[in-house]
A protein has these predicted regions:
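Extracytoplasmic/periplasmic solute-binding protein
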Residues: 147-155, 160, 186-238, 284
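Extracytoplasmic "Venus flytrap"/periplasmic binding protein-like
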Residues: 74-139, 151, 167-173, 180, ...
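Short, solvent-exposed loop/beta-turn-alpha elements that line the ligand-binding surface or hinge
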Residues: 127-141, 204, 208, 226-251, ...
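Hinge/lid segment of periplasmic solute-binding proteins
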Residues: 41-49, 112-167, 216, 220-222, ...
């Protein structure tokens, strides 16, 4: 009996000795916002194979919903960590984020559009300065900071301008070399309109003013008068815009709506899909949109790479011959610091996987056939060290123009004071399109200038 007891005690001592050499499992996790770099390294699964935590990503970009759903399924299959992706409809992200953040199961991963968006959500943002994701950035310039904290990380760099069907343009007797300024664009567009019956196509796609499409004009086109005013003043934000270049804004808007596939009075009923269909079915030569739209315009049953290119959004200001595309980001990933520690770590792990895993990187940067399912990838240019070159030719065009000495137009619409400001400008543009009087344009100017000061005060006190 004594021998058995002695053997049992020796065995127990050996087990305890081995246990002392391994992980204790009793270390406390740092509180949200105070992690060290080591604390945010990808954690993987817990011993025993049970996944820790879950991810809820509220996605901003409806055009990439399918790809994110597929990536979420792949990640869950590989790790066991549940990943839910919910995508807001175009123009509804802020409203949906506000609603979802009030719920018990709030998003663990969300995004803001830049400094103005961060101002609304900074109290929810986990400090990413010690995260593995932050360590993967190619430049600190892609980090969105709140004081010393890294509140958001840009996950895609994009460009927009005017997408051109070069085949149709050639049928009209022109090439992109003939368009080096706003006046050149106006001459070509108005000539196409004059010969529309003969040619069988229009100059521009419909400039839809429903919520799926109006952001192209109340935000992206509106960036141009803001950019040039900021350039004049040497500033990068303001509490009161003057509207110095709103005459040029009107000239471009007039060109779009009076040389398009539909009557200007119909624009409030026209959607993003209407404009896309105008373009891919050969009904229009010009389509204001961005690099994110590549997979929607090129591919099987659509146009070919040889059919399309992108030119700058000429505005009739400055050295237009040396103007580049409008390039920047309004897509910053943030992590909800009010989520549980397990869910925060699960979210950090998922984000890191997205920018380092071969399958995820191919999905984010690849084009036709890049998804494991065989579908088109997101064709993004992403600012992370492991990223391959994007297969998106619009991204390559931006790089080529910059290398040739052309100046990209920066994204200053991230300083627009509120979503309400954008909506008021959009509504005024739609009213003007239906009845193009000076009085109605004055209402656009008022929405742009007067409401900027009002909305800025409401947002900043």
């Amino acid at each position: 009996m004594k021998k058995k007891l002695l053997a049992l005690l020796l065995a127990l001592a050996m087990v305890m000795a081995f246990a002392a050499c391994g992980p204790t499992g009793g270390e406390e996790s740092p509180a949200p916002g105070t992690q060290t770099p080591a604390a945010s390294e990808p954690a993987g699964e817990e011993p025993g194979g049970e996944a820790a935590g879950s991810v809820y990503y509220l996605n901003f970009k409806p055009e990439q919903d399918g790809q994110w759903q597929e990536l979420a399924e792949i990640y869950t299959a590989e790790t066991g960590v549940p990943v839910k992706v919910v995508t807001a409809a175009s123009g509804t992200y802020e409203t949906m984020l506000t609603s979802e953040m009030a719920k018990d199961e709030a998003p663990t991963m969300f995004q803001v559009n830049g400094p103005v968006g961060l101002n609304s959500w900074k109290d929810y943002c986990y400090d990413l300065s010690g995260s593995a994701l932050y360590g993967e950035l190619t430049s600190e310039d892609y980090a969105l900071k709140n004081g010393e904290e890294v509140a958001g990380i840009a996950y895609v760099i994009e460009s927009y301008g005017i997408i051109v069907n070069t085949t149709l343009l050639a049928e009209a007797g022109y090439s992109v070399e003939d368009i080096q300024s706003f006046e050149d664009l106006k001459t070509v567009a108005e000539d196409i309109t004059a010969r529309k019956g003969e040619l069988g196509f229009s100059a521009f796609t419909s400039a839809g003013m429903d919520s799926s499409s109006d952001w192209r004009f109340k935000t992206h086109l509106a960036n141009l008068p803001i950019y040039f005013e900021y350039q004049d003043k040497g500033i990068n934000s303001t509490d009161a815009i003057e509207g110095t270049y709103l005459d040029q804004y009107r000239a471009v808007w007039d060109l779009y709506i009076n040389n398009a596939t539909c009557d200007p009075a119909e624009l409030t009923a026209k959607t993003a899909n209407d404009a896309l269909n105008d373009f891919v079915t050969g009904q229009a030569v010009f389509y204001q949109n961005g690099s994110w739209e590549y997979a929607n315009v090129v591919g099987e049953g659509k146009l070919s790479d040889e059919d399309v290119t992108m030119i700058p959004l000429y505005f009739g200001v400055g050295d237009e011959a040396n103007q580049g595309l409008c390039t920047g980001s309004e897509n910053y990933w943030c992590v909800n610091k009010n989520a549980s520690e397990e869910n925060i770590q699960a979210t950090l792990d998922f984000m890191y996987w997205c920018v380092t895993d071969e399958t995820a990187l191919q999905a984010m940067t690849g084009g036709e056939g890049a998804m494991p399912s065989g579908g088109a990838g997101m064709a993004f240019a992403i600012p992370f060290q492991a990223a391959p070159e994007s297969s998106n030719p619009f991204v390559a065009l931006d790089a080529e123009m910059t290398a040739a000495g052309k100046t990209p137009i920066s994204w200053n619409f991230t300083t627009m004071p509120s979503e309400e400001w954008k909506n008021m400008v959009g509504s005024a543009l739609a009213v003007y399109a239906a009845d193009q009087t000076d009085a109605n344009w004055d209402a656009v100017v008022s929405a742009f200038v007067d409401n900027w000061a009002t909305e800025y005060q409401l947002a900043n006190g």
